[in-house]
Amino acid sequence: MNDLRQQQMVAATSSSGSESGTAVESAAATSTAGSAGAAGRPQSNCSANSNAKSVAASSTSEEEQRVSSTSSPAQRDQQLNADRDREQEPEPQQQQQREEALQHQHNQPGHITSTTASPPPTLPPPTTPCDDAPSTTGASASASSASGEAPSAASAAGAAGGPMAATALEVESEERDGHKIILKLSKHANPNSNANESQPGGDERRVEPLRIQLPCGGAEGGLVAKQQDAFDADASSCSSSCAEDEVATTLGQQLRNTPHIVPKLTIRAANERRVGSVVPKLTIKLPENPAASGSNSNSGSCSAAVSGAQSAMPAKNDAHLSSLSPASASSSSASSSSSSSSSSSLAEMQTVPKLMIKTTLAGSSCISSSEELPQQQQQIPKLTIKTGGGGQEHVHTVIMTHDLNNAQSIPKLTIKTKSIEMIEDEQAAKLEQQLQPLPKLTIKNLCSPKHKVRAVLEEKPPTAASKLAIPKPTPNPTPAPMTNGGESNSSSQEFCGFSDPDADIAAPASDDVRRNSDDMVIDDSLSKEHDPKIFHNLPPMPASNGIASGGSKASKASKSAQSQHNVVDMVDLTSSPSPGSSPTHVPNNFTGRISPKGLLIDCLRMQTAIGCYVPEEADSRVRPAASPNSNILLSQLTAPAKSFTTTTPKSKSSKYPQLTERLMANGSGTGGGSVIAAESEAVVGPLPAANPAQSIIESIEILDTPDGSPRVAYMDEDSNPMLNKHLQTIHKLAMDHGVEQRMDTQDNNNENHLKRTNSEGNESPSSRLPPSKQRRLDNDENDQQTQNCHDPARKCSESLQALPPSHRSRKQKHERILNTDLEGSLFPPTQQQSISTPDQNGALSSEVEGEDAKAQDPLEPATPQPPPVATPAGTGKKRGRPKRIQNQSSPDGGGAVTPKPGTPQEEANSAVKSRRVQLLRKRLAIDMVSVGQEQADMKAKEKESSVGVPNARVEDGLAETLESPKTRDHRPLRATRRTTTSTNTNLQPTPKSTRKRQSKASVQQSQLPPPTMAQFGSSESESNNNNNSSISFALSAQIDLTMCSSSSSTSSGAAANQQVIGGSGSSSMLPPTTILSSSDPLPDVIFQPNDFSSIMATQQLRSSRPSSISCGSTGGSQPDCHDEDNYTSALDNSGDETALPMPPTRGRGRGRRSRGGRGRGSSSVDRAVSVGGTASTTPATQPRAPRMSRGASAVAKAIAMSRPRCVGGLKHQPDPERLKGLFSPSPQVFEEDTRMSADLSNSNQSMASLMEPPLTPQKQPDFLNNEESQSSMVSNVSMMDSNQGQSADAILGSALKRPKKKKMETCVAEDTDYSASSIAEYDWPPPKGCCPSKNRDTFMIQEQVALYLGITSFKRKYPDLPRRSVDMEERNWLQEKGLVSEKLCDLGITAVWASDILDIMYADFFDKYEEYKEYIRRKHLREIEAKQKALGLTVGAGRGLQARDRAMLSATKWNAYFNKSRKDERQSCMDLQTFTINQPQPRTAPTCTRLERSTSDLIRAVAEEANIPAPPNLLPPRDYDEAFRNSDYAYPLTVVPDQFSMAYRQFEPAELRAYPLDTALDKPPTDLMAQLLQAKSEAVGSDEIKTSAPAPKDLGQEQSAIKSVTVTAPVRRSRRSTRQQTDKVRTASSSSTSSAQSVSSASSGNGSSSDTESGDESDFSSTSSCSSSTGASSGAGSEDEDGNECSSSVRLSTCGVCLRSQHRNARDMPEAFIRCYTCRKRVHPSCVDMPPRMVGRVRNYNWQCAGCKCCIKCRSSQRPGKMLYCEQCDRGYHIYCLGLRTVPDGRWSCERCCFCMRCGATKPEGLPQVAALSQASGGPSANGDRSKAARNKRLKWVHEYRIDHVTKIREHAAMFCVPCARNKPAKRQSAAGAAGAAAVTPVLEATSAQTDDSPMPSPGLTTNGGRALSPTAALSPKAAVPVASLPPVLEATTVTTNIAGTIGRRQAGNAVNITTMQCSSSSSSNFSGNGVTEDAANVTATGTATAAAGAPAATPIGIAPPPVVA
């Protein structure tokens, strides 16, 4: 839902990521103008989850900002080339820079979908004094346009060869109120950074004009829904993941009671780096804000335009448009900063949408060799903020140098801020009206955590006041000074280590009201408080800032010189959720290369990752600084990219671009962001130039996803920025405590970092961020409006503040994706949790975090903590409080964590902040005790700086965030918010900011945990940070932070929802009073980390108020949650959901999940992710405490809803109606199907009901008096009756008092209306294990049914109805599921089978039955809809397509499978007219034309005439050919319409009369029948005669039999055979193989015929019954088969395997067919590898092929895998029919074949006589018969095998009992067998009787052939025959006896599976030599060795087929 919402918002405003991205890019482009094409390389982050690494190598004059996201190296190279090209031309003019920004844009491959011809890249029309000067955004702008309304071509930013011309982001303010940000994509012009030169008008890329009009009026309503770009989800994820991305511009954010929310526009460029891309023109029109002074946010946009030139980064085409180039990010940052340039406190400033441009191109190598620093391959774009103040131009240049060591480049950002007065001469007068804010440049180096970038604000307080104004000053790009101001905030914060959280926090304070726009996070505090533009450059600014404030001032001066460039407000176009992902994180805004390279180098030496404000050229040219920046950039990139927000508020804004944008729109100044940025810069500045050595940061993906978010890098980056700031501060300002603080801060940062890593799973940046936050907090104190960024404190402040916004924007994006939490937990450093948290929660947590991080970060011990404290209260506070860790204690400024967003104002308000913190603490009744020791330390410090302890900070942060960013205009609002913060009501207002809230919460949580761990343990600290940050932010943005925190914990789900809500709802602007009212006093709760993420584990404010604060932030956000839940309909049941938001009192204050005030929210949020957060939304006010905890009902509902009630085929879930009917109308809100939930929570609800006064008097109906009531009336009152509103006590009391008159099975008021929904249908027992439906029945409750049907006594009316009492377990289960009320359970419930009830209803109550059926149907549909809704909430834009593709793929697979099965298994089709089965020609048969067919027919005819064998490869005749030649097939059929028959037969009228076409008129002519019969017999005779050589007698008999057989049988059989042939043909080969042992027919001997006949008769009868064929005469048995062979004629005259005739088998030898009795298919025995001996036996019974084979005993062909096949006769038996457990190992022989060929014994022990003889001769003892029986299983038949000399098939030659095998001479075996045959006959007969007694059940008389003969009978008739036939066979065979082998095979018990036997024609072919194992494997079932062990089983029928034995 969050994603969807965000997308919707983006679509609406096109501003989600794109606006800010565009603004940033323009700013970057403008500032880049000085710095050649550094921005040209900005890469757009491809994936929302990818961290945008700001990798920029800043050329001497060129600044490169590169966000290395997931861009390919080639793209990076292209970007580098483009950057280098840009670097080549360093023209200082701002206009040129702006043009270059446009160039960069075109260079930058933006994934802009739609391209419209864009106006020529003319300099943005001179911005009206107030209006944002047109700012050109770099390619990132085009990238950011991806999802924007202007879907400019994905190729935005000329990803092609040349550096991308940054899109000019023109912010034309028609009036000061209106800010128009126009993103112009200019064609890639000369790589020159000069905007004018490099960007000819013709060069402009096509830009689709995107116009956003922001109403000037209502702060809450003012926010235009942000449209996310086409890639909004991606963009939002990217931007929110990267704070950098979020360049929430506070442009034009006037502190107003009703600030405008400027939609955040995220433009993502997916274009290939080199290809010029069309960047949509983004025009953001901000209606004039009431406060004129604040209205000049244009300067920021101008600045953005200036930096935009450089900011242009190639966007990665493949990447999502969501990311714009880092340059664009920087430009957006600049624009934010400029927007806040106007005096933040007094004048309400218009908020200028944050323009964020994300480039997907990986900026991993912003290696364009910089002219100045070729050694540093990677350039960091220089960010120059030029502030033209009255008569004074201040240029702040932030140069981000790539740390070659870190291998990351940081874009150089240049922000030119000209006060309106300072703008071009024409505009100078206009600009004069507004003070010139001194832009604060904060550059965060994500690359190197160790390096910090320092933002130096050259101008002192005066600029702070005019900061917002500055953006407008120059129509030329010159006014860009603030361009990156808002962004810089987040950047610097990131560098500082508190990252965007601080700035973000500050932003939230002012932003609170405006935070409605999901993606737009613009901190008013940024615009207000940061007079100096803090450029939160993600790329660590080169030490240039660190060089000397003088250098920074020089850069300012240079910028002033360049003041002509229009100030462009940077609008963060990237969605705030992923602050770090968007390229904006790496701002490429460089107003010019004015900053002297020396300065930049010095800065680099200082390793001030963030150059505060070095002269633009210096910054641009200082590439050495890039390396420190690189580290920071690495951190930033690794961490969620943070928008470069010049203004401190940007800390929040950068982190939460949406919030920042909103704040900007609502008028919150970017001042706070600027301050933070400055602070960050100051802190980072001191970093030595060593960073330059660091390698450019390779592209770091900023993942919006919780785990994906590059939090670690982010945290590191923050730390680095802090270090850089500290270094800079120390180096430049030589701040004594700066070094110490830096060291301490580094320690703190490290600790935080580690802690964060522990808590969040991210190590590196974690500590960095907190230091930044701390620094920022310190700077907040020191960095008042009056303080200059150059002042270390101010720098730190600005940097810190700027940092949090960046982080926030990214964080928000993550949160929107619900990744924030995971992100924080996974990448605590990346997210810079402490900073990020403050950003989310407000300045407080960010400040605290910053301090903590500093303290923890050993690298940043010297960071001046006080400046971080100076960070605006909102920013520092939120952050500071949670982040305030013991480690933080070292940084003094950390204590002063006061949010820095409004630093300029914050300074003034510093005292007020601490006082407000105290007041807020008092109001909220926050116990600071739980803050922790470090926080206590922080408390003192922060209290001083109005940051105080996390609680104080939260309060302070809220107050200050409100005050500092919005202090001037929104001060009361802030106070209210503070109040609100304490109050749960905050939740209600926050819904508007839900998404922001989520991202904030996640960011806060993620950020906070490490600092908190230091202080309270990461979870507590995070909780505090989240809460504080949430509070400040939620209060300022009124975002449901509770939801956020829960969402952060569940970062993947709820956060996104919340963000969405925030975006959609304007409730975030709810009056603080409401928020206050909503908070209920709740005990302080410590949030424990959520299951979803450690981030969630945050300590709630210590006191009930703190929990309230947490709740306040959470509460403030909770309404958001509610809204979010409502909007998101996260609750599956929206019906009750609405109620939840109503009672804010219910608020998160009561942590349901051990989350303290937020606990509920979090749990509810967690559940909200699943259930829509109803719990959190449910008002605490509701008296549902007795029920489950607040969230309980929602949880119960969720459980109940998730609980499938399957009754029969119907799923039964109680309806909302049912709920309403069953339960009292208590205020509790249930989800749709929560009736169960209500019931479910009966304990809770009933308690609630009891506790609540009855809403309506409950009648004591007569049912109480009913005589028939089953049980006591007391319990009779059920929760179901709660609907009547009478309390349970009253009911119970009345029940006791009233006499029982009637008995009713259910006691319910008579007037109660029971609907179908009241019937519980359930399955019992509940599903278990793998077979859920096993032993389950569907039941109903008799009492409920009786009530529904209106039956007084169901038992009496239906006495015979089966019923059962419900046991305790079932009753409890029913109650839990809410299916049965407690009252009913107490009365006693009876279960009846649902089927019976349905039958009764159908028979007797049809209307009720129909009603119930309809109810079930509708319920089922509702369930489906609910599931779809639940799925739809999280379904991304592409899911529909994915589903379609999956469906297509599934259909394709199924069709393929179906067709394959048709070809393989269902080949045949049956003609229903003739019942003729048509089969496809075998594949072996060549396809031929009719001509070939006729030719083959001719040849065949000639061959037959000449008695010549037909050629083997001759095509077989078609079936119809033979069919029409045979009587069977010659049945006339009418032709169906359109049926075509190629061959047909013409009947004569006389013939037709004999056929019953309609009615048979004549009898068939006798002559015709005779002819047919004769033809048949002749055909068969000739056929058989040809192949009868082996058995002439048999053939003769067969022929005679055929003649005697009536024709009907053959015809019928042949038809049946044809019908069955389909499957049989396929299986014939395998079956015959299994039956591959047979004795040649010749071996059957003379007596075989009679025996065969009798045997076959029995076989046939049984088989025929099996195959549904009637038995024939005894002679018909074998004769029938042959006769059928004849009748089948041509079609059946070929082998089913080789397709040859009988006289020619596969070996080209004549061979008689064997025919399957069932399918009539004929095969050559050799084709199925059937040995000759087996063939002889097969011919003696109705043999079936493998496909048709039926078990001889059960007559079933099912379960062929369980079938054993006799290796001698090929009969099949199921192992379970034989009593065997498994398939025997070796070969197996059936009972009929298991007899000794010498003695006729049917057991392997032999006959008793033989046993005695053998005993005498050493054989088995005679008296050992019983003992032998005991050893029976161990004895096995001895088999002899031989290889047939003709077929080479291994066949079974003989079987002997053990004594005979021992005694017989091997060579004389055959003779012995022959001699003993006569004697054996009686023995066999005797044995047959014994066999029946054998343990194994006899197969039955019918076992083998289905014979009905008794065993003796079966044996006796054939006894003589087998004996007679044996000798010849034995003689012919060479016997190889393998006793051991046979024994091994023979174990029937061990038989495993004989599946192979049935289907393998290879089994017999495998018979080789001994082949025992082979055979065992193949013929598993046939192992005869088992005969002994399984003898009982085999014996009974064993000898039945003696002929078979032969």
UniProtKB/Swiss-Prot annotation:
Span list, region Disordered: 1-208, 313-347, 458-564, 744-794, 821-916, 929-1029, 1044-1082, 1099-1196, 1579-1685, 1887-1911
Compositional bias (Pro residues): 118-128, 861-870
Organism phylogeny: Eukaryota, Metazoa, Ecdysozoa, Arthropoda, Hexapoda
Chain intervals with Low complexity compositional bias: 10-60, 129-168, 321-347, 543-563, 978-990, 1018-1029, 1103-1112, 1161-1173, 1627-1652, 1660-1677
One of the GO biological process terms: chromatin remodeling
Domain notes: The PHD fingers mediate the transcription repression in heterochromatin. The SAY domain is essential for fly viability and transcription activation.
Record's compositionally biased regions (Basic and acidic residues): 525-534, 744-758, 936-945, 963-972
Function: Essential transcription regulator during early development. Coactivates transcription of some euchromatin genes and repress transcription in of euchromatin genes translocated to heterochromatin.
Region annotation SAY: where it falls in the sequence: 1340-1573
Principal subcellular localisation of the protein: nucleus
InterPro entries (UniProt xref): Znf_FYVE_PHD (IPR011011), Znf_PHD (IPR001965), Znf_PHD-finger (IPR019787), Znf_RING/FYVE/PHD (IPR013083)
Origin species: Drosophila melanogaster
Gene Ontology, cellular component aspect: brahma complex; cytoplasm; euchromatin; heterochromatin; nucleus; polytene chromosome; polytene chromosome chromocenter
Organ and tissue specificity: Widely expressed. Highly expressed in ovary. Expressed in nursing cells and growing oocytes at all stages of development and accumulates in mature oocytes. Expressed in the nuclei of syncytium blastoderm of early embryos and in the nuclei of different tissues of late embryos, larvae, and adults.
Classification via CDD domains: PHD2_PHF10, WH_NTD_PHF10
Molecular function as annotated in GO: chromatin binding; transcription coactivator activity; transcription corepressor activity; zinc ion binding
Keyword annotations of the record: Activator, Chromosome, Cytoplasm, Metal-binding, Nucleus, Repeat, Repressor, Transcription, Transcription regulation, Zinc, Zinc-finger
ZnF locations on chain (PHD-type): 1694-1751, 1753-1796
Compositional bias per record (Basic residues), positions renumbered to this chain: 1147-1158
Protein name as it appears in the record: Supporter of activation of yellow protein
